[in-house]
Amino acid sequence: MHILLANDDGYLAPGLAVLHAALAPLGRITVIAPEQNHSGASNSLTLQRPLSVYEAREGVQKGFRFVNGTPTDCVHIALTGLLEDKPDLVVSGINQGQNMGEDVLYSGTVAAAIEGYLLGIPSVAFSQVDKGWEHLDAAARVARTVVERIIGTPPAEPFLLNVNIPNLPFEHIRGYRATRLGKRHPSQPVITQVNPRGDTNYWIGPAGDARDASEGTDFHATAQGYVSLTPLQLDLTHRGQLDALDQWLK
């Protein structure tokens, strides 16, 4: 089993190191991650300049390769030229903070898994609910459990999974739930600041609170102490509007 690891928090992030340690007994692990934090990068590719790949020489990251680009860059170049043999599985994470509801449209963590899926490799994104790295050991144990299940009982079709893990001690996690994406309220307003030169600067505001956290959603499952596993698809066609649009065009 050959597993490619990526993330969006950068190759020095604790979530990547513990994920690597947790999955190492399961097979050969290749790490190719961004040099810097690229949270919110979504599926962006770097097209205006060449990319470089480096290798960490010390610490727990020794042997990790990192790229001066986005999470999608990392997986793309890994699967389209950098690696001589393609991995059996792409795993992204463990992200610092949840990726639920509309978060999946912005998340670099989910984007890395999407790129693997687009290039024909089963892919999983792992995120830990709430900021901070509390109970990261528990999140790593959950990730290993999910990957072991994938290895032992592979799904019948190529898959793209989004996994969100409650920020709890392992013994307090109640189990696993198959979920759908919930929905958020719109994001909070931008935060404005005036710098010493008198220029106005803008910071993107916090994400909106959950609007649909009903039973069956990722928001509901994690709030109840369950690990949320959401199968994703990439077809954004609104099929319910096709007939109406066709009539509108006539």
Swiss-Prot record:
EC number: 3.1.3.5
Binding site for a divalent metal cation: D8, D9, S39, N95
UniProt enzyme class: hydrolase
Any GO molecular function: exopolyphosphatase activity
Compartments, as annotated in UniProt: Cytoplasm
GO cellular component, one term: cytoplasm
SUPFAM superfamilies for the chain: SurE-like (SSF64167)
Keyword Membrane: no
Cofactor binding mode and count: Binds 1 divalent metal cation per subunit.
Bridged cysteine pairs (disulfide): none
Keyword Hydrolase appears in the UniProt entry: yes
Domain of life per record: Bacteria
Cofactor(s) this protein requires: a divalent metal cation
Record field: catalytic activity: a ribonucleoside 5'-phosphate + H2O = a ribonucleoside + phosphate
Keywords, comma-separated and alphabetical: Cytoplasm, Hydrolase, Metal-binding, Nucleotide-binding
HAMAP family named among the record's database cross-references: SurE
Annotated function: Nucleotidase that shows phosphatase activity on nucleoside 5'-monophosphates.
Similarity remark: Belongs to the SurE nucleotidase family.
Name the UniProt record assigns to this protein: 5'-nucleotidase SurE
Organism: Cupriavidus taiwanensis (strain DSM 17343 / BCRC 17206 / CCUG 44338 / CIP 107171 / LMG 19424 / R1) (Ralstonia taiwanensis (strain LMG 19424))
